[in-house]
């Protein structure tokens, strides 16, 4: 709600200070979805020894790993994200709470497909469910706190760039093609290098048919078509 209040056409959104550890770091994605031009986690330059609840000193990954996850995922394509965001092509979603009551859901029941949020693009909707998933359903063991996040950028007609963690995404056609059969033309996992997307592997049907699962921080380039 705070991001909504401060993100206006006459007021570019800038987050001057925010928590840099724990599940709240997922709201970096929410800020990007509101067109933020800056985001500054507090205490990243603090070199003092910090101790955990058991009294032992925390290592760097325990102190900064949550913020590092965001930057490691998006830094290689920061310029591309900024350009796409300026053009109004970027949308994001973050997990607001861990839902322990909904059950695993069924990928075979597309009428009641497990969905927490839906993002709307030209000709396509992206249904998003947060948490840990296997190929077919949400698994029993979930993170203690909500940490799911997804960024989807529209690259062209039926072509999208996705970056996310602990979520599942299923596209479906809308408008006049709502009832048409559709398919993934290609789903590539990779990263940006010097402004170009370089695929490290192409996902097969078993890895895409029931939704795109982001079990680890992952970047995908997706091409869709309708018959």
Region roles according to the model:
Residues 2, 21-24, 47-50, 169-170:
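Flexible loop/turn segments at secondary-structure boundaries
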Residues 1-28:
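Glycoside hydrolase catalytic-domain groove-lining segments
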Residues 29-167:
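Aromatic- and carboxylate-lined catalytic core of secreted/periplasmic carbohydrate-active enzymes
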Residues 14-22, 39-48, 184-197, 201-202:
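A generic structural motif
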Residues 6, 27, 31, 50, ...:
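Aromatic-residue detector
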Residues 119-227:
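C-terminal beta-sandwich/jelly-roll accessory domains of carbohydrate-active enzymes
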């Amino acid at each position: 709600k705070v991001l909504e209040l401060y993100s206006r056409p006459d007021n570019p959104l800038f987050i001057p200070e925010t928590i840099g550890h724990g599940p709240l770091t997922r709201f970096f994605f929410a800020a990007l979805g509101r067109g933020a031009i800056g985001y500054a986690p507090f205490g990243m330059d603090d070199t003092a020894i910090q101790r955990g609840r058991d009294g032992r000193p925390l290592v760097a990954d325990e102190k900064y790993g949550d913020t590092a996850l965001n930057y490691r995922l998006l830094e290689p394509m920061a310029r591309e994200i900024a350009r796409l965001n300026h053009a109004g092509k970027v949308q994001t979603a973050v997990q607001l709470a861990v839902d322990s009551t909904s059950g695993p859901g069924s990928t075979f029941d597309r009428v009641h497909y497990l969905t927490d949020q839906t993002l709307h693009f030209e000709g396509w909707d992206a249904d998003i469910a947060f948490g840990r998933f296997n190929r077919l359903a949400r698994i029993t063991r979930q993170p203690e706190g909500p940490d799911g996040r997804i960024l989807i950028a529209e690259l062209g007609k039926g072509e999208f760039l996705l970056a996310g963690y602990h979520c599942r995404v299923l596209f479906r056609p809308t408008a006049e093609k709502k009832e048409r059969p559709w398919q993934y033309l290609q789903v590539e996992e990779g990263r940006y290098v010097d402004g170009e997307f370089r695929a490290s592997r192409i996902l097969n049907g078993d890895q895409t048919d029931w939704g795109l699962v982001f079990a680890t921080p992952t970047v995908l380039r997706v091409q869709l078509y309708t018959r």
